Amino acid sequence: MKRSYIIVAVVLVVAAAAFYLYTKNRGVRVVEYLVAIFPDDARTEKRSTLPREVAYKAGPETIKGETRPGIFMHPNSRLIFHKVTIPDSGHLRVFLAVKEEAWERPGGDGVLFRFGVSDGRQYDELLNQHVDPANNPADRQWVAQDIDLSAYAGQQMDLIFNTQDSLPRRPPNPSNDFAVWGAPAIVVKH
């Protein structure tokens, strides 16, 4: 008798999880996980004032108990994914965060996350978001971003991810600016 209750409970949990995942991602199809092609793909270019092994790291990142594949970048670094073909109805889905160990440390003033695209002739900035969990508790989580790329459908574009250590017109302050781009992916919305 106990065994049948356990089986029923397991089936209900699996069904509930499947329904949750279906409704959560309904109408969205992932075209390319950018973390999967980082860091060895020939299409990626990394620019930083720090050595590459210090400036960038791909792997699981946990923010407020939620783990996502991510790309850690020190501030004042740039990561370029070259010649990514943008699909019809394409969007960049990404989650921004500053690592938890920076939240309580003194001196941090957050990270400026910038994202844009370029066809090699012109750069279009599509995201400019300051995340400052040390001074803004609402930023102590993954900050979801959905960036419409449909204006570039069918084109091969460079996807350019930048992190800066402070806002414009502020003195540079790289203290505790542990920036993470969480689960960056090109998705198609239906």
Spans of features found by a protein language model:
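N-terminal Sec-pathway targeting helices
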Residues: 1-12, 19-21
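Gly-Asp-aromatic-enriched flexible segments
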Residues: 17-190
